[in-house]
Design a protein with these regions (language model features):
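AMP-forming adenylation/ATP pyrophosphatase catalytic core
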Residues: 14-37, 60, 161-164, 229-335
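Catalytic subdomain that performs nucleotidyl-dependent activation
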Residues: 127-131, 136-227
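A generic secondary-structure micro-motif detector
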Residues: 69, 111, 169-170, 199, ...
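Hydrophobic (often cysteine-bearing) scaffold residues that line and stabilize catalytic clefts
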Residues: 44, 75, 201, 205, ...
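Short helix-capping/linker segments at secondary-structure and domain boundaries
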Residues: 55, 214-219, 285-293
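ATP-dependent adenylation/nucleotidyltransferase module used to activate substrates
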Residues: 2-148, 178, 185-186
Length: 335
């Protein structure tokens, strides 16, 4: 059926959905919205289209078709119709990688598709906007607490970040899913239903855990917000110290594929942090490897390092990763 979309009105320019886009995009003359057809990215594209037209900026929609469901062709047609309606070009990347459902190959699939996704983003040479909202942040909090990782950023996302040399902007990160749905319904914006399976961990958090917490005491989630805001200052301070320490780590390029990193075990920052898994995960991400060792592997390394030193030894952290441990240094070898 024909979409009876409400026209953008003067009062819409003062709404938070619009003003957040305006604040975050002011310095850019070109930007793209990664659109899936879900309510978040559909509403985001609506406001971004209005912003681009009003300010004479270049705007486009980009979509990755994973071809992993029978309905994918219909979804692409839906997005094409939407792009014509808001007068924005739609660029599509077709994925032809078959996903193996076994956990054994899941990491390889996710790593490969992530690289393709960010290479696609990078090809446009502009910031990419994503429709993540506050509910996504809450899901990340519980996922990170469950995995005992990313204590330095439990939300797992920020309004602006740089990932794989791509500027990522999330204008709706402080907006609730409910407010986004209500606004989309008011504006008659069509959208596809959430495809996250109800049986998945994310689905259970979205459909059961978070609603249960809200029913028990809605102030609990607000408390998470305030806690993260309060600790952000300390996170930023720690990150500055981490970056200074990281610059002091000696890198030795042995060949095109082999590198080593020497860590001073008596360095004050190292001594204060080496027993924290988040420290090792943060350090690992700076090495820009395609995959990382498991949490279990990092815990085993920490237990090894906590043991009083008696003699030189070698610790295997993962495939092609070994660590030579001496009294005063760690030498990490990557192959």
């Amino acid at each position: 059926p024909e979409i009876q979309l409400k026209q953008f009105e003067k009062r819409n320019f003062t709404e938070t959905f619009y003003t957040r886009c305006e604040e975050l995009l002011e310095q850019y003359n070109k930007f793209a919205v990664s659109i899936s057809g879900g309510v978040d990215s559909m509403l985001l594209s609506y406001y971004c289209s209005a912003y681009a037209k009003r300010n004479k900026k270049e705007f486009m929609l980009i979509h990755i078709n994973y071809n992993n469901r029978k309905c994918c062709p219909e979804e692409v047609k839906f997005l094409n119709d939407w792009s014509h309606l808001i007068d924005a070009p739609l660029k599509i990347k077709e994925m032809q990688i078959i996903r193996d459902r076994s956990s054994k190959y899941r990491e390889d699939y996710e790593r490969t598709t992530k690289k393709i996704r960010f290479d696609f983003y990078k090809s446009f040479g502009c910031p990419v906007l994503l429709g993540h909202n506050k509910d996504d942040c809450y899901e990340n909090i519980f996922a990170n607490l469950s995995k005992q990782i990313h204590f330095d950023n439990l939300f797992g996302m920020r309004p602006i970040s740089v990932n794989n040399d791509v500027t990522i902007i999330r204008p709706f990160i402080n907006s609730s899913k409910r407010s986004i749905i209500e606004k989309a319904l008011y504006l008659n914006i069509p959208y596809l239903e959430d495809s996250t399976p109800a049986w998945s961990v994310r689905g259970k958090m979205r459909d059961s855990l978070i609603p249960m917490i809200q029913d028990f005491d809605c102030n609990i989630l607000k408390g998470f917000d305030e806690y993260i805001k309060t600790t952000r200052f300390f996170e930023n301070y720690w990150e500055k110290k981490f970056n200074i320490w990281r610059d002091s780590v000696n890198e030795n390029i042995i060949s095109e594929t082999v590198k080593s990193y020497t860590i001073d075990k008596i360095d004050e920052f190292y001594v204060e942090n080496f027993q924290e898994m988040s420290f090792w995960i943060k350090f690992w991400f700076t090495l820009q490897q395609q995959s990382r060792p498991s949490n279990k592997s990092f815990r085993q390394l920490i237990e090894k390092l906590k043991t009083p030193f008696t003699r030189n030894s070698t610790h295997i952290l993962g495939k092609q990763v070994k660590i030579n441990i001496t009294e005063n240094h760690l030498v990490i070898h990557l192959e």
